[in-house]
Design a protein with these regions (language model features):
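Catalytic alpha/beta active-site cores
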Residues: 1-82, 89-309, 327, 331-340, ...
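Flexible, glycine-rich loop/tail regions that form catalytic "lids" or insertion modules at the edges
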Residues: 4-41, 48-61, 67-68, 74, ...
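Conserved active-site and cofactor/substrate-binding residues in soluble primary-metabolism enzymes
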Residues: 52, 101-105, 117, 153-156, ...
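Generic, well-ordered alpha-helical scaffold segments in large soluble proteins
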Residues: 109-116, 155-165, 188-196, 236-244, ...
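Short secondary-structure transition/capping segments
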Residues: 134-137, 386-389, 461-462, 565-567
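Short hydrophobic/aromatic segments of transmembrane alpha-helices and their interfaces
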Residues: 140-142, 261, 356-357, 404, ...
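A short glycine/serine-rich beta->alpha loop
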Residues: 172-178, 262-265, 348-352, 383-386, ...
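Active-site capping/gating regions of soluble enzymes
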Residues: 270-275, 279, 298-479
Length: 569
């Protein structure tokens, strides 16, 4: 009967698990499974959690992650639906976020960070003007040029940014953290790659662009066009990339900014997942097929010090898989919740800032316990400055120590999964996330909840509680409200700033570009206007537009066509 069949399957699975010997001589299985022959326990595990890489993906999105590659065979993953490209890498989570000064400054930082890596996974931070679609010569922005991220005005900046990297190589990928002007920035990347390698490079490009407009309205405030127009431009980009860039993730549905704005871990998960379901509905309404675009959706979560983070990503993987299978009838590849994690920026404290090294290490451990697909670990000095090279290196080495020096992840998968405490946290978090879903549904869905300012108001209330708890001492912050060194506040710290000379160099380059392309730019902008006004694909046209136009020129023309974002009051 069923019990006998289940036991036979379980024994077959167990017998196929490879054994490995650690340097100290300890024999371990490559995959930790519950030690039981009880059919009820086996059924609860196989159907409630699933084996790594199997529905509902609680333990991980893929069957092998972090394991020492010299001792196991690479996992070949199936190609994308309808003729996409196969992906054959075991997951390596290190993806470090960088962006400072001008394009060549960030390029040097990228080369420094990846000098000993086989798999080069860059993650790009942009400066304030770029994030808002402004040029470096726009009124009032000079002081922000190159601060907190890299200044990108033109396709020439984009060429400098990734110079010397093999853009089409299967071991290279890039992530871009940008939202409002994301289509123009990705168009610059595609056009710059074509300049350097020719048109054949386009289907080989691998990477991710954030482009999550819904969370901008809810938390980060970097939406620059009206919501309806922004969603249209996003869908144009998803439609184009799904057809022409099969290795590209055209959206990273992001809870990180929601959490950094003050949301609780449960709110982060609930708002991120509900935003994701809304995007699926929007893309399907355009006529896109879920099994085509679904595998190209990715996610980005915060990982802080709260106990919820012991199981938050596990819950998200399960709920996403169930909804994609049962509500949207998506296949297994679209059911996978592919996750990039960043350690918490909000948890970093300027007082006795070297304590941040410990905070980040603990958060990194939690992210790896949750089998994140990639991870950025913050630098200890980010609480008060653009990260310095010293602390960037320490952040990178923290990941190497976690994955290569310790034995927690490289010998055995699922080392921590299934503990009684984890199960309690997992169940409680899941129930709380579902309660948030019910409230959003009661309001009429995500877009209606945005009109009611529901997500924003809940985030603000949570942020207020968080700060109040710190002020009252109910939330201990070591070195700030507990065990404080009073002399620490008098010690000087090094603050990284972009020199004024470099800011002026960026402006001069931009103005030279505009002079060279003056006539061609006006014609290119008129052609873009024609496409937008007549319902064509804006992104396809942008790849041509960026050859002659700056980011600010494109943004200004689109503002003329669709207007500016105005929040509901």
């Amino acid at each position: 009967g069923f019990q006998k069949e289940l036991l036979n399957r379980w024994r077959k699975i167990s017998s196929r698990i490879e054994m490995v010997t650690t340097p100290t001589g300890l024999p371990l299985p490559r995959l930790a499974l519950p030690q039981t022959d009880e059919p009820g326990d086996i059924a609860r595990y196989l159907f409630g959690e699933g084996l790594p890489g199997e529905f509902p993906f609680v333990n991980s999105a893929y069957s092998e992650m972090y394991l020492a590659k010299s001792e196991i065979r690479p996992v070949l993953r199936s190609g994308t639906a309808e003729g996409g490209n196969p992906k054959s890498e075991i997951e390596e989570p290190t993806r470090l976020f960088a962006g400072l000064g001008l394009a060549e400054d960030t390029n040097r930082r990228f080369h420094y960070l990846t000098q000993q890596q086989k798999n080069i996974r860059l993650s790009t931070a942009f400066d304030g003007p770029t994030l808002y679609g402004l040029d470096s010569d726009s009124d009032g922005v000079l002081g922000k040029v190159g601060e907190g991220g890299v200044a990108i005005d033109t396709i020439e900046d984009m060429e400098r940014l990734y110079a010397g990297f093999p853009l089409g190589d299967e071991h290279f990928s890039v992530s871009m953290t940008i939202n409002g002007p994301a289509p123009a920035i990705l168009a610059m990347y595609v056009a710059a790659a074509k300049r350097r390698f020719g048109s054949d490079i386009v289907p080989k490009l691998r990477g991710t662009i954030q482009a999550d407009i819904l969370k901008e309205v809810q938390a980060q405030n970097e939406i620059i066009f009206p919501l309806e127009a922004s969603l249209r431009f996003l869908t144009d980009m998803v439609e184009f990339t799904t057809a022409n860039l099969p290795r590209w993730y055209p959206i990273s549905i992001s809870g990180y900014h929601i959490a950094e704005a003050g949301a609780t871990p449960v709110q982060q998960a609930a708002f991120t997942l509900s935003n994701g379901f809304t995007y699926v509905e929007i893309f399907r309404d355009r006529g896109l097929r879920v099994n085509r675009f679904g595998p190209r959706l990715s996610f980005f979560l915060d990982c802080g010090l709260e106990v919820e983070y012991l199981a938050l990503a596990r819950v998200c993987r399960k709920l996403w898989a169930v909804a994609m299978r049962d509500v949207f009838q998506a296949d297994a590849r679209a059911q996978r919740f592919k996750l990039h994690t960043q350690t918490s920026g909000r948890s970093l404290v300027a007082q006795e800032f070297k304590n941040n090294l410990t905070r980040t290490a603990v958060e990194l451990l939690l992210a790896c316990i949750n089998a994140t697909n990639s991870c950025h670990s913050n630098s200890a000095d980010e609480a008060f400055t653009t990260p310095s090279q010293e602390f960037v290196r320490l952040a990178a080495q923290a990941q190497a120590i976690m994955l290569e020096e310790t034995g927690l992840f490289k010998f055995m998968m699922n080392t921590f999964g299934g503990s009684p405490g984890m199960k309690i946290v997992e169940r409680t978090v899941e129930e709380a996330v579902l309660a948030e879903f019910r409230e959003i549904d009661r309001l009429g869905g995500v877009l209606a909840a945005i009109e009611h300012r529901y997500q924003r108001s809940q985030i603000q209330l949570a942020a207020h509680r968080y700060e109040q708890q710190i002020n009252e001492g109910a939330r201990p912050i070591i070195g700030l409200n507990r065990y404080r060194d009073e002399a620490e506040g008098l010690r000087p710290v090094k603050v990284i700033r972009t020199p004024r000379k470099k800011k002026h160099l960026q402006v001069e380059r931009l103005q030279r570009f505009k002079r060279r392309h003056r006539d061609a730019a006006e014609s290119a902008l008129d052609e873009l206007s024609e496409v937008v006004e007549h319902g064509g694909n804006e992104f396809a046209e942008l790849i041509k537009t960026v050859e002659h136009c700056s980011l600010g020129q494109i943004t200004a023309r689109l503002h003329e066509l669709v207007g500016h974002y105005r929040p509901a009051i």
